[in-house]
Amino acid sequence: MSSSDPNLRGSARREFLWQCSAAVASGLAVGAAASAGDQPAAGELPTIQLGKHRVSRMIAGWNPIGGYSYMGHHMDQHMREYYTPERTVEFLQGCEQQGVNTHQYSPSDKSTEVLRAMRERGSKMQFLCLSSGRAQVKATIEATAPFAIAHHGGATDTMFAAGKSGEVHDFVKEVHDRGLLAGV
């Protein structure tokens, strides 16, 4: 048979792919065995330290819950209708059961209701607020008791572009002065 025989070419390709997949699989097995001591226990997610808090490296975000799809106002509305406070609590409880221990939210009546319900149901989830209004820092802390407040990135960019970086600094200082972790 010549190398132009389609049966031979297909067979050679299959053999090559089989050898590659076997090599990859054995390499993955060796790598997994070598780093098994570095991995969290089954069912746990990796975490990082933020101050005195252990935060899962995956956090539950606010955009879908708050109705921010970046796909237009119709999708935003559908998301807001779907993520009722009760569904949001169920979603966050499911996240917590899977090892996600932190929820990043924006201040709103809905988030206040959801965080209160989570705590009433015994959740150990930690709450990280994303905000930009210095005037609302105290009220946000009183209403939702986050462990940290970060200045919203889009607002930060806008303020820096307008030469108002001092306002971002003042926001961070306000959060720190109230005893919370602060970020930008």
What are these regions (language model features)?
Residues 115-123, 138-146:
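Acidic (Asp/Glu)-rich catalytic clusters
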Residues 60, 182:
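Conserved, mostly hydrophobic/aromatic
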Residues 1-12:
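N-terminal secretory signal peptides
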Residues 86-108, 144-147:
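Catalytic domains of carbohydrate-active enzymes, especially glycoside hydrolases
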Residues 108-118, 157-171:
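Active-site-adjacent beta->alpha loops and helix N-cap segments on the catalytic face
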Residues 10-15, 26-43:
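N-terminal twin-arginine translocation
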Residues 71-85, 127-133, 158-161:
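Active-site mouth loops of central-metabolism enzymes
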